[in-house]
Amino acid sequence: MLRLSEKMNRLGTETAFEVLARAETLAREGRDIINLGIGQPDFKTPGHIVEEATKALRDGHHGYTPSPGILPLREAVAADLQLRRGVEVNPERIVVVPGGKVTMFFAILMFGEPGAEILYPNPGFPIYESVIQFSGATAVPTPLLEERDYSFDADAVLDQITSNTRLLILNSPANPTGGAVPRAEIDKLVAGLVDHPHVAVLSDEIYSRISYDGREHVSLCSYPEIADRL
């Protein structure tokens, strides 16, 4: 009988994919389904992107690439960050990975080990807590407060930091609440983090372009005082 490592028992799953599978089964049975279980747009990949991807393959742009990703793509990402967030990022600091979960997994494994503490938003994306536990670190939830429109209290987060804290995970706009942290609270958090140089920050901003009611998205990239640990 196969024996898996103990840490595999600490790796949870994302139930949204179970909902997706059930919804697709019902759709095949002819049911009219509106699936709210997974973060996927209701439109297909735009045609010009499909055409360019197909053309690149036909032109021979495949095979192994540099580990961080091809330079033209990293330069394009840097240009997009400058355009949308007003920050300059050296393309040499950009790494292209196949999806957000891979980024989270790598970042958490870089800092997570027995005895370490990692702070993560709660309620939040379930993979945060799952991978923290997989790494052997202690998962410390930072509450997102309903009375603050599911934002956090910067002072409360800073009070949770100890000498064992290795990583602070932020997600704004947040999954699943949709809450966005206001600039004043992020200013306060960053000012406090200056006193905790041993703490790295993982800023999950995947929903930065899904913002309504004129709400401002504040990127952690715009704070040079923590750029070396972001």
Language-model segments: which ranges?
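A short helix-loop-beta submotif of the ANL/AMP-binding
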Residues: 134-140
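Active-site phosphate-binding strand-loop segment of PLP-dependent enzymes
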Residues: 140, 145-215
